[in-house]
A protein has these predicted regions:
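N-terminal, cleavable Sec-dependent signal peptides of secreted/periplasmic/extracellular proteins
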Residues: 1-202
């Protein structure tokens, strides 16, 4: 019998060729950027929210910096965070680093004209809205509308100028849920909008 007569060949593990070398797959990094109010405006300070995910869509820890600027940042929770940035050029890039691997991403292009709108909590039941427009748009009366669950909760006006204009909005009586602030002119043109989650104290 051939199989019984054939000699047994023993190969030591160290002598065996490695036919399938172990390779480490580079982690795919995705990053999305969301200027507060929807737009980056040249020479106007803006907060930029971001989210960093892997190839499965899950948020991951990361650090980053704006190329050519002394601006660094890191994720806070589930791959999300924010940084403050004043664009001086139309196009800017951000470097995101995850586990020692760095990728470069484009920020949304900065626009030459428009408004930057920021929304911050003020006490336990109010928010303060700040609006800062470019020179050619100053001196206009703009509308500010607050909706929650698709219903109008508040409406008022704000006067735009070179310095940020402010308006305080009470959230008393506003139900818990996703709210949205809209900035628009007398013709109904929407310049900026911003969502936030309101947690009712009732």
């Amino acid at each position: 019998n051939y199989y019984e007569a054939s000699p047994v060949i023993t190969i030591k593990r160290s002598d065996a060729p490695e036919f399938r070398p172990k390779t480490e797959k580079l982690r795919k990094i995705n990053a999305s950027f969301y200027p507060e109010g929807g737009h980056l405006i040249l020479d106007k300070e803006c907060r930029v929210a971001f989210k960093v995910t892997d190839d499965t869509g899950f948020g991951i820890d990361a650090t980053g910096r704006v190329e050519g600027k002394d601006i660094t940042f890191s994720t806070v929770h589930d791959g999300m965070g924010w940084f403050t940035f004043t664009p001086k050029e139309k196009s800017s890039k951000v470097q995101i680093t995850v586990d020692g691997t760095t990728r470069s991403f484009d920020l949304p292009q900065a626009e030459p004209f428009g408004y930057v709108m920021t929304v911050d909590p003020l006490g336990s039941d109010s928010i303060i809205v700040r609006v800062n427009g470019t020179q050619g748009l100053s001196g206009k009366t703009l509308g500010l509308g607050l909706t929650c669950r698709g219903e109008l909760m508040d409406f008022g006006t704000i006067e735009s100028g070179q310095a940020p204009a402010e308006r305080i909005i009470s959230l008393r009586g506003v139900p818990e849920g996703v709210c949205r602030i809209y900035l628009f002119d007398k013709n109904g043109i929407n310049y900026s909008s911003r969502s936030f989650y309101h947690r009712s104290k009732v």
